[in-house]
Amino acid sequence: LGQQMVFLPGLAEQKAIARQLDFVEPQLDNAKEQLDQLESLIKSRFVEMFGDLSQYESRDLCDCVSSLETGKSLKCQAFRRMGSAPAVLKLSAISSGIYREAENKALPDDVKPVSTKMVCEGDILLARKNTPELVGRSALVGHTDGNIMFPDIVFRMHPCEGIYGVYLAYLLANPLFESVRALAHGSAKSMSNIPKSELARLGVPIAPLELQCAFAGFVSQVDKSRFIAQQQIDKLQTLYDSLAQEYFA
């Protein structure tokens, strides 16, 4: 290691590089902070509207969704798709709690996608298998450009009539998250797996429909700001990564 040659630009160039990176980093931090504040706003509103969840009737998750299924993993390229070409989601598409369809891997031309495993608007996707820190993470698909599959390490569910997807998705990602993660089997150092049969029996508090509707309307308004903030984060992160690649690769 001591004999390794390291490229070291001149002092003026080092300062120029530092200025560019220092310009991007605060903007990235601010956008992430804005996203956190919006998430806190939703959490506060949820508690304000629903209060103690134990006051509501509880149903098994399998009685709250019309289906609970795993996806399909196919041989993929190392890069994301172009346009609406067929692709498979990466786990990073849902691990933040916000559905990010750009996190995908393109399918090769000679691999045929499976139509029954395509993501649809209104789906709730939940990480069935992942590291202990990320297993159980979930996100609601508010919009999809189509032609994109979910992998076999993800559960897909769709709420039954009478249950708002926004409400159920929020429950799974927040108040019930620790209960979901507690279902996972596996050691602290290995990939953890949530059995379908155990997830199906998870107790879900069902609030009155009018409250669910009001909460869904509130989240819809906040989501407009969350979408803008997430777009800004993605753009700034791409810029930062490209600068780092240019200067340090």
Residues of each region from the PLM?
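A short glycine-rich beta-alpha junction/loop motif
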Residues: 1-12, 80, 147-153, 185-213
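Sequence-specific dsDNA recognition surfaces
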Residues: 62-78, 92-124
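A short beta-sheet element
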Residues: 1, 90, 115-173, 195
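Non-catalytic DNA-recognition/assembly elements of restriction-modification systems
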Residues: 3-18, 26-72, 201, 206-214, ...
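Short, solvent-exposed loop/turn positions at domain surfaces
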Residues: 29, 112-113, 188, 227
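Short coil/turn segments at secondary-structure boundaries
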Residues: 57, 74-81, 183-185
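Short amphipathic alpha-helical coupling segments at ligand-binding clamshell hinges
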Residues: 20, 164-171, 211-214, 218
